[in-house]
Structures are given as structure tokens and as C-alpha cells.
């Protein structure tokens, strides 16, 4: 057991975890008083699974994210000539272009903090301190930020062979997996579902069935805000959907509303199914008596000295017309963190 009590522990080293560590340092927390735990330190799922996926965030906002934290030292990183800095600011891009500078930031932040390549399995609050238990060690911290990410959701229809989402969303991996004469079902109509449908069409699959619950939703620039900013289709994915989903369906693609009749009729035709129906928080960490406690979606507070950030703990926010969405995206995480971190400093154990 490690005898030191850290001021802050950050669990997770994806974009939200990197932002949290950077902002703590910016606010004067000494790096050696910050415990940072992640099993890989490879920019989370973004770096390990999604780098070949097209973003729905503009390049300009990725650059804003990197420049917003002084301890990121991204001014120095600019000398590295990351490809991100050469791209048109108003365009979207492959996520690999933000992963590379984030990995650079993560690498140097690890040098100035107490970084441990482990997985937290359990946490408990006692004596006004959090104990974080990994397979190898126990650590203590006064405050903990969970930036543990989320996994693709599954619908678990019986008797179907599931093609993993992380394979389907990566066109290169998908091309090595599919058989063109097989039938593939894709569940969903979100950004990722449309990307996967496009992949399958462009790879020449002969029969594709899309099961969906709602029509395509598009992000619309309203000037100083964006309608359906978090849930709407953007960029090249939106253009493709307008032409091929709301326009003329490719000959290989059929679409059906999800209901009992359509599932019974068409699902048996499919050799494999792909679930592109969103994400859900990881559940591989047991937190004392907090298993059924919901986080506050406006403050990120889970309990005293315990906070959540990132895709597993997004801010809930209404647009000017009252439509409420979860704010998911790197720049949105940063804006939210800037707003709530002063509260976190006061809401200790």
C-alpha cells in the first residue's frame, strides 16, 4: 500500500483525463500531488480504437482544446508540425489528427505527475479519503476525477452474430472482415451508424439492412449556436446521408423501422449485425455504496470529493429552444471543466 495521500487522483487518460490533469496543474496543484492512473496511456479509446474515424468536430475546436491549457505547452508542440495544424480550420478530419498531439501532451504530463499504468478496480471513502484499489496496489487521494470513458451499447437480439462496433467503424478493419456476398444489418441512424452504412456501401457489400427508430437528424449552424450540435449529422457524413438516405437509397441498402414485424421478417436474413446505437459508461469500477448514485449532469458531482468528466459523465444542456442534449466532444468537455472546476475545489470530502 502506498502511504502517500494525493491531493487529486485522475482515473483515465483519454481526452477528458488529459484535460483534467492539465487544468489541475494550471490551478496550482503540484504535479507530484496528482495521481494519474490508466492501463495504457494511449489517449483512451479515442487513441486505441477510433483514430481512423472521421470526426464531427471542426479542426478549429481541436486546436482550441489544445491551446486552452497552459500546462499542455502546445505552443512548444506546434514546432512538432502536427498535421492537425495544416488542416483547414472549418473542416472536420480523421480523429488520428487530434490523437497524435494528445499523445504528445499525455507523454509529457506523465513526467510531471505520479502516473501509474494500472486499472482501478474498486474505490471506497473512509476517513475523508478515497482509497483506490488496483490489482497491484492501493492508493489514497482526497479528491478523485473519473474520466473512465464509455463502451458501445449493445441491443443483444438473440441468435445473431455480432460484428464489433470498433471493427465496423474502421473502414480498413471492416474491409478485412466482411464478405461481400453476405447480408449485414446495421442498427441505428446516428453519426456512427451512417458512417458504417457508407463503409458497407462503398466496400461493395451486396445486401445491407438498416434498422432504425428515428429519421436522420442534421446539425444546423444557426449563427452563434448549432441546432442538434451533439446528435446531428455533420460534414461529409451529413452530405452522404442527404443523398443516400433521404435521397435515393443505394441498390444494396434497405431500411426498416424497428418493430416486431420487421425484425421477425428481415433479421433472419442477416449473417451479421452491427449495433451503432450509442455508448454507455464503463461499469468495471466498483465505488463503495455509490453503484446506484447518479452524477449531477450540471456539475459533474458524484459525491464528496468524487467527480465525473467526459463521455461517461457529460453535461446536460438545453439549446435556445429548450431541446436538451448531452454535451459530448473535446471542446465541450473543456468548456464544461472550466465552468465546474471551481466548484469541485470547494466540494471536498
Regions found by a protein language model. Give the residues of each.
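N-terminal FAD cofactor-binding segment of flavoenzymes
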Residues: 19, 23-80, 214
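Flavin (primarily FAD) cofactor-binding/catalytic cores of flavoenzymes
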Residues: 1-43, 85-349
Amino acid at each position: 500500500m502506498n502511504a502517500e495521500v494525493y491531493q487529486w487522483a485522475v482515473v483515465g487518460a483519454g481526452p477528458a483525463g488529459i484535460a483534467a490533469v492539465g487544468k489541475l496543474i494550471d490551478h496550482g496543484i503540484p504535479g507530484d500531488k496528482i495521481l494519474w492512473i490508466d492501463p495504457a496511456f494511449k489517449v483512451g479509446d479515442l487513441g486505441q480504437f477510433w483514430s481512423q474515424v472521421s470526426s464531427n468536430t471542426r479542426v478549429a475546436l481541436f486546436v482550441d482544446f489544445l491551446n486552452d491549457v497552459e500546462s499542455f505547452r502546445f505552443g512548444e508542440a506546434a514546432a512538432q508540425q502536427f498535421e492537425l495544424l495544416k488542416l483547414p480550420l472549418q473542416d472536420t478530419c480523421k480523429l488520428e489528427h487530434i490523437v497524435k498531439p494528445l499523445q504528445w501532451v499525455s507523454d509529457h504530463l506523465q513526467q510531471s505527475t505520479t502516473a501509474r499504468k494500472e486499472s482501478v478496480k474498486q474505490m471506497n471513502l473512509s476517513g475523508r479519503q478515497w482509497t483506490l484499489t488496483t490489482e497491484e496496489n492501493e492508493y489514497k487521494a482526497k479528491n478523485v476525477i473519473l474520466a473512465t470513458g464509455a463502451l458501445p451499447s449493445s441491443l443483444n437480439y438473440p441468435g445473431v452474430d455480432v460484428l464489433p462496433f470498433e471493427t465496423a467503424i474502421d473502414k480498413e478493419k471492416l474491409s478485412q472482415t466482411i464478405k461481400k456476398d453476405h447480408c449485414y444489418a446495421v442498427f441505428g441512424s446516428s453519426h456512427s451508424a451512417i458512417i458504417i452504412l457508407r463503409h458497407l456501401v462503398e466496400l461493395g457489400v451486396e445486401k445491407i439492412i438498416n434498422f432504425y427508430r428515428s429519421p436522420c437528424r442534421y446539425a444546423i449552424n444557426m449563427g452563434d449556436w448549432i441546432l442538434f450540435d451533439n446528435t446531428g449529422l455533420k460534414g461529409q457524413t451529413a452530405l452522404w446521408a442527404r443523398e443516400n438516405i433521404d435521397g435515393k437509397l443505394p441498390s444494396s441498402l434497405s431500411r426498416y423501422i424497428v418493430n416486431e414485424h420487421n425484425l421477425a421478417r428481415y433479421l433472419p436474413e442477416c449473417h451479421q449485425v452491427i449495433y451503432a446505437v450509442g455508448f454507455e459508461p464503463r461499469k468495471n469500477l466498483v465505488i463503495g455504496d455509490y453503484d446506484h448514485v447518479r452524477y449531477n449532469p450540471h456539475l459533474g458531482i458524484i459525491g464528496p470529493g468524487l467527480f465525473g468528466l467526459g463521455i461517461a459523465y457529460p453535461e446536460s444542456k438545453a439549446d435556445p429552444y429548450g431541446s436538451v442534449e448531452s454535451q459530448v466532444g473535446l471542446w465541450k468537455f473543456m468548456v464544461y471543466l472550466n465552468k465546474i472546476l471551481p466548484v469541485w475545489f470547494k466540494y471536498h470530502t
